[in-house]
Swiss-Prot record:
Keywords: Biomineralization, Calcium, Gamma-carboxyglutamic acid, Hormone, Metal-binding, Secreted. Ca(2+) 2 binds at residues 15, 18. One of its GO terms (molecular function) is hormone activity. The modification 4-carboxyglutamate is found at residues 11, 15, 18. GO terms for cellular component: extracellular matrix; extracellular region. The lineage of its organism: Eukaryota, Metazoa, Chordata, Craniata, Vertebrata. It comes from Halobatrachus didactylus (Lusitanian toadfish). The keyword Metal-binding applies. This is Osteocalcin.
Length: 19
C-alpha cells in the first residue's frame, strides 16, 4: 500500500511540474 501511495504522490508532483 505504501509503495502505491508513493507512486500516486510522484504522479501528482509530475503533473504539478508540467503545469
Amino acid at each position: 500500500a505504501a509503495a502505491e501511495l508513493s507512486l500516486v504522490q510522484l504522479e501528482s508532483l509530475r503533473e504539478v511540474c508540467e503545469q
